Amino acid sequence: DAGSDLQSVRLKATFDDEHNCWRLNGVKRFITNGDADIQLVLARSEEGTTDGRGLSYFLYDRRDNAVTVRRIENKLGIKGSPTAELVFNNAPALLIGERRMGLIKYVMSLMNGARLGVGAQSVGLAEAAYQEALQYAQQREQFGKAIIRFPQVYEMLGLMRAKIDATRTLLYETSRFVDLYKTYDSISKERSLTAEERQDMKYSQRCADMMTPMLKLFASEYANQVAYDSVQIHGGSGFMKEYKCE
């Protein structure tokens, strides 16, 4: 039930001294690719805690037969990535990294990549919807001329193009900042960074942390708007499955 409030994760992790491993118990919902054999999972390892400082990161193998996929969600889209509800019944798991750092350090570091993925996916979807609308508007004739020659349709296509180009620019700039700070992080494992490099790394990370949620917001919103407008330009045909914009 935690949803986006990751600090409220309630899946419980307890250490099994006899078998020298961690055990996971509880339910998790809306888990991306939840039917995979190997999974990373955030769980509460510190008894009595209620915030992010009590969460650790674990790896489990579903082939241990201690995790049940209770259901696969029937989603509106993104059907190639199963979203599952999982039940953990004393599932053995391995601790990843340090205790108590699951959310603060590890999950948050993965969020930038996930948000970039959503942004790129949204830009691609919007571009495809625009191209379908443009092609249809150029070919479909009403009242003796192609509908792209009607001001309302031409203006709608222009706004769609502007939204896509703006979002693509935000995607590329956000990706640049993520690349920079990750590159500096990799270099720092081989040698000490100069003062200028450390400053640039911190700046790039701050920009990435700020821009990735913005990218996810605007890209996904504009993708929905562009897809909707594509259906509108297709008219009644946009409601039919034989047309790709549906």
Predicted regions, residues:
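A short core secondary-structure module
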Residues: 21, 25-67
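A broadly conserved detector of short glycine/acidic/proline-rich loop/turn motifs that flank catalytic sites
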Residues: 1, 28, 45, 62-64, ...
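Short beta-alpha junctions and helix-cap segments that line functional grooves
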Residues: 9, 27-28, 69-74
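Short Gly/Pro-enriched turn/cap motifs at secondary-structure boundaries
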Residues: 1-4, 30-32, 49, 75-82
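A glycine-rich, basic-preceded beta-loop-alpha segment at the flavin cofactor/substrate interface
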Residues: 63-66, 70, 82-114, 131-149
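Alpha-helical interface subdomain recognition
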Residues: 6-8, 16-17, 21, 87, ...
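Active-site lining segments that contact anionic ligands and/or coordinate catalytic metals
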Residues: 8-10, 19, 35-38, 52-55, ...
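Beta-sandwich/jelly-roll carbohydrate-recognition scaffolds of carbohydrate-active enzymes
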Residues: 1-16, 48
